[in-house]
Amino acid sequence: MVIAVYPGTFDPMTRGHEDLVRRASNIFDELVVGVAHSPNKRPFFSLEERIGIAREVLGHYPNVRVEGFSGLLKDFVRNNNARVIVRGLRAVSDFEYEFQMAGMNRYLLPDVETMFLTPSDQYQFISGTFVREIAVLGGDVSKFVFPSVERWLQEKIGKPE
């Protein structure tokens, strides 16, 4: 049984994230979506909210589990007996950071592979940062996130649906 971990801040979970989860869940026996605490990123949603959002969006996948974590990714990977780390690459700008991170993870976890997936064409430009900014400024994010995520955003911002 091959277990993979897909770590991220998921602030919020977008259609691009779900696209990668859907595709990775078809490759691995079990996919653990690791929602990172990431206090240095100053997330818009709390860790508990981000876990709740991810569980709402991904709850229909039978082999996907959503867990929060803080600390080193290597510890989360080991605690879940994972053999693969899944990462998404939207553009060349993501590659340099992800390449360095994969190298560090290989050093810390020599028996764990990093697998890069690119999003489907319609999701290549979506980022949580863009979604939050558009939502805060009153724009329509319905093409980028699921209805439940849009509701979470509207509640957090304090705007009616």
UniProtKB/Swiss-Prot annotation:
CDD domains noted in UniProt: PPAT
Amino acids binding substrate: T9, K41, L73, R87
InterPro entries (alphabetical): Cyt_trans-like (IPR004821), PPAT (IPR001980), Rossmann-like_a/b/a_fold (IPR014729)
EC assignment: 2.7.7.3
Subunit-level organization: Homohexamer.
Keyword field: ATP-binding, Coenzyme A biosynthesis, Cytoplasm, Magnesium, Nucleotide-binding, Nucleotidyltransferase, Transferase
Keyword Coiled coil: no
The protein's annotated pathway: Cofactor biosynthesis; coenzyme A biosynthesis; CoA from (R)-pantothenate: step 4/5
Reactions that this protein is recorded to catalyse: (R)-4'-phosphopantetheine + ATP + H(+) = 3'-dephospho-CoA + diphosphate
HAMAP family the UniProt entry points to: PPAT_bact
Gene3D superfamilies: HUPs
Cellular component, GO, one term: cytoplasm
Source organism per UniProt: Cupriavidus necator (strain ATCC 17699 / DSM 428 / KCTC 22496 / NCIMB 10442 / H16 / Stanier 337) (Ralstonia eutropha)
Record-marked site positions (Transition state stabilizer): H17
Function: Reversibly transfers an adenylyl group from ATP to 4'-phosphopantetheine, yielding dephospho-CoA (dPCoA) and pyrophosphate.
Superkingdom of source: Bacteria
Protein name: Phosphopantetheine adenylyltransferase
